[in-house]
Design a protein with these regions (language model features):
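Glycine-rich cofactor phosphate-binding loops and adjacent beta1-alpha1 units
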Residues: 46, 53, 87-151
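Mid-domain Rossmann-like dinucleotide-binding core that forms the NAD(H)/NADP(H) cofactor-binding site
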Residues: 26-99
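Glycine-rich phosphate/adenylate-binding loop and adjacent beta-alpha elements
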Residues: 1-18
Length: 218
């Protein structure tokens, strides 16, 4: 994230940075390993197990990837999303409707409204994981957070834990659910269509989730 060159045609990286991709996964969908790793990191840090009930707040790329990661772990997961097309994507990956309190609430938005909603759906002693970036500061309902001893994890994208990289687990998620790309990647463009691709990605009315450049499109 801190090194220039992400838009270059070629990049040299250390071999240790490479992750093997299952042959069932379309190469053009391999870009989903990155947002999946963001989701995995939050679950790894909170030691999430298959008996934990998960709520995902936000139906963008990270939110929908978090649903996939939760399903990979064997968890029951529900989604709160703003737009109908995001709710539909969540349903396709097995998410239900937000209801009650949860062992893990994953806020993939990070604004005041979603943080308040997230705290309201946290069980006493549960984890609130911040995958969305609160650009204007973190404003949590103080009394409820303290009285219920809600643990808050600000997550720094991804890393490795006990020698296992989040990217490696993310690649396994993609291998188990190779059709994730059809759900999350809503728009594909050639490199020549870059201006339109960025326009669609920024347009809230385009019903986009993940917009990518696909080298197979000419």
């Amino acid at each position: 994230m801190s090194i220039n060159g992400g838009m270059t045609e070629q990049m040299i990286v250390p071999e240790s940075c490479l992750i093997e991709l299952d042959s069932r996964v379309p190469v053009q969908d391999a870009c989903l390993v990155e947002p999946l790793a963001v989701a995995i990191h939050g679950f790894v840090k909170t030691k999430t197990k298959n008996h934990h009930r998960i709520a995902v707040i936000g139906g963008g790329t990270i939110g929908i990837c978090t649903i996939a990661a939760a399903r990979y772990l064997g968890c029951k997961v529900d989604l709160y999303a703003k737009y109908d097309h995001q709710i539909e994507a969540g349903l396709k990956l097995g998410a239900g409707e937000l209801n009650g309190q949860y062992d893990r609430v994953i806020d993939c938005v990070g604004n005041d409204d979603t943080l308040k909603l997230s705290v309201n759906h946290c069980k006493p002693g549960s984890w609130l994981v911040l995958l969305g970036i609160p650009l204007k500061g973190i404003n949590l309902p103080g009394l409820k957070t303290i009285m219920n001893e809600i643990k808050v994890l600000p997550s720094i994208m991804y890393s490795s834990t006990d020698g296992v990289k989040d990217f490696e687990i993310a690649a396994k998620v993609l291998a188990k659910f190779p059709n994730i790309g059809k759900t999350i990647i809503t728009h594909r463009f050639s490199l020549e269509e870059s201006e339109e691709a960025f326009r669609v990605a920024a347009d809230k009315t385009s019903e986009s989730i993940k917009v990518i450049f696909d080298p197979n499109i000419s």
